[in-house]
Amino acid sequence: QYWALGHVHEQQLWAYPDCTIAFPGNLQGRHVRETGARGALLVHADDDRITQVQPLELDVLRWAVLEVSVAEADTFEQAVRLVGQSLQQLLAALPDGHPAAVRGRLQGATAAHAALLARQSQLRQEVIGQAVALDADRLWIEKVQLASSPLERQALDDADWQDTLQELDQLMQVAAQD
């Protein structure tokens, strides 16, 4: 026996001794939540028995979410270079000729967070520029999301606290005189 359900978008296969159940997935990812290879299942049968189920990749464009750690970046420019390196790796992993629609997500605690946050429009343009430089025909940037965070502030020692309190006291004295 063989059961196939076609409207489930993720390909899944269960093979039991007396029954095969297949969700062949969809032929083409239609949005960023449908990443990776898409296609169909070619089912070979001999009389009343399934002998082989072969996945076929049929999509003409891949959706990808590119998670880029910018934790090592100290500057805006270093973060952009890290994205470029990740785009290059993605491009190398794609089947020959396949284009990709890419959502980039920069994440991690980084010294560059404030610069990235302040220059988000430029960040998007820089990422698009990286994609165009690598392969304008195969990489399309759908969106660039900033999910980074600032580095944790280091705890102040007693001397730093004392200096900070003295500065605050001086500011209060000046404010009282005005």
Over which residues does each language-model region extend?
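Accessory, non-catalytic peripheral segments of nucleic-acid enzymes
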Residues: L56-D178
